[in-house]
Every structure is written in C-alpha cells, then in structure tokens.
Amino acid sequence: EKKAARRRALIGEALALVGLSDRAGSLVGTLSGGMRQRLSLACALVHEPELLLLDEPTVGVDPELRRGFWEHFRALNRRGGTIVVASHVMDEADRCDRLALIRRGRVLAVGTGAEIRARAGVPDLEAAFLALAGSPGGEARQ
C-alpha cells in the first residue's frame, strides 16, 4: 500500500514535470512525437536513477518546460545522481558542469564551458566548437 502510494506520487510528479499531467490516462498511441519524448523522460525519472543518460533532452520543448527540466536535473545531481547529456545545442551543453566536445568521434576538448571558451579564445561555446574543430574537413587546430 505504502509502496503503491509512493509509486503513484512519483508518476504524478514526473508527468507534471514534463507537462503531461492532463494526459495521464491517455494511450501512448494518441500522443504526439514531442509528447512521447517527454513521456520517455518521465518514465526514466519515476525510477529515481543514479545515472541518467539523456539525448537532446529539451529539443522541441518550450522554454518554461526546459527550465523545469534543468531545475530537476540539477536537483537530481545535488542528490548524488549523475547525468550525461548528448546534445548538438551548445546553449544546452553549456548548462552542464563538464563538457566533452566531440566531432566525428574525436574529442576536441574537455572541461567546463568557461575553460573550453577560454582555451578557444572566444566568448561562446558554439564559436569554441567551431574554432576547435578547425577546418570544414574536421582537423582540429593545434
């Protein structure tokens, strides 16, 4: 009984976080692609994971939900959880504590966003990625 109540509470919290509380009784097949993406995140969060692997977690999500997601990710991290984010969105990557910029399977740089920007000598992470990637052929500058 207590376990079931806890599970229901976690499900409710996860659905609220991803903005799907009003769709709690819906069949997955009736949800849009974006809603399904958010539901996948909710399913992962219900289990209170110690390690959360996220691939483009906020692409296509409105700014209000995006802020809520990142607040939740930070809270999970403060409780000892580890979050690994794969993203092509540099603004999103810059929210992470540590980054590894990778191009074509090659690590270009590892560090905080500030460290990587300083190393590249540019003010933003996207410019740092482009500078460190070097030529269009993908050779990094030395």
For each feature predicted by the language model, list its residue ranges.
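Catalytic Walker B motif of ABC-type/P-loop ATPase nucleotide-binding domains
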Residues: 52-55
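ABC ATPase "signature
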Residues: 110-111
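Conserved ABC ATPase signature
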Residues: 27-31
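Conserved ABC ATPase "signature" region
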Residues: 3-23
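Conserved catalytic motifs of ABC-family nucleotide-binding domains
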Residues: 48
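Hydrophobic anchor residue at the start of the ABC signature
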Residues: 41, 69
